[in-house]
Amino acid sequence: VNRRPIGYYIHHHGAGHRARADAIAAASEWPVTLMGTGIGAAGVDLPDDRLEIEFDGADGTDCRPLAFHYAPIGHSGVRERTARIAGWIAEMRPALMVVDVSVEVALLARLASVPTVYVRLNGDRTDPAHLEAFRSASALLAPYHAQLELPSTPEWVRRKTRYLPGITAPGRRRNSARGRVLVVFGRGGSPGAGDVLARAAAACPDWEWRAIGPVTAPSLPISNLTLSGWTDRPECEIAEASIVVGAAGDGLVSAVLAADKPFICIPQERPFGEQVATARGLAAAGAARVLSLWPEAAHWPGLLAEALTLKAGARRALHVENGPLIAASWLAELAAAFRAQRECTA
């Protein structure tokens, strides 16, 4: 059977979008073409659309339509990016476009007569641009459990959404010989403060502390603290931990739930309150100990003891095994259904 590809657009801010796309593509029997800035030979590499290296989402224009979030004027990268996506659609005639995430790309694909699945992140996304992207999509994919949904999300959006938690690398459920705290810092925010981390480790001498991701070097070395830098396989580090500390991005939350680890969650500020919404849902479910700020060093011994008392059943209820395969199979079903519709109306 000639299967036209599923196009999968990946936003370039942070690492979670790419990790989710890679997991789904690897599990898919239907051909998937990844596209995004920095994709390289793995798919369709798109020109960068950022005004500055330090991207803050602002486009510097005062005449942006309400249906857009980011539409700078006079930017060659945006023009070339749009042309490349439209050209690929015209040439490959994709069965479906998954957009993770960009309201502009979602509307572009829809305007090009392609059915879309929009990846809907958590948070209050009731602004006009998000609602139009949701309305234009044939379906919505939420990479988290429905129990974490904000109460303010419109009912029609919920009905259109397929909740697919567990889109992550398979969890490895084992513990290190010694109690280990793993602190995870992602690419979507500022580097971790090494001195603050060192003080926390010093306050808990019976624990081995380990950090992955970008962290500044502490002023003085601490014997029970190891900074391991960036890793492409965070699930391996998570598997060796007794407790995980980190923010509330979908990628990390999914990986921690997959590994069934006690979680101390410190959400970071993100547009539309994404991480705060997820953290509140985790706290309400009893699946994590949630803090609004990094605590003083003296509080860490008690927090670690408290994390160990969290009930495993609460976090297990928010996870689904084989998430990438379930997501890939669902997308393939949609692609096949849309192809059948086109054949019937041809």
Pin down the residues of each PLM region.
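Conserved nucleotide-sugar phosphate-binding/catalytic loop shared by glycosyltransferases and other
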Residues: 3, 11-12, 27-80
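A short, glycine/small-residue-rich beta-strand->loop->alpha-helix junction that serves as a flexible
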Residues: 9-22, 189-192
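Active-site-proximal region of nucleotide-activated glycan assembly enzymes
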Residues: 114-171
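Nucleotide-sugar donor-binding patch of glycosyltransferase catalytic domains
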Residues: 262-306
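C-terminal amphipathic helix plus adjacent low-complexity
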Residues: 302-346
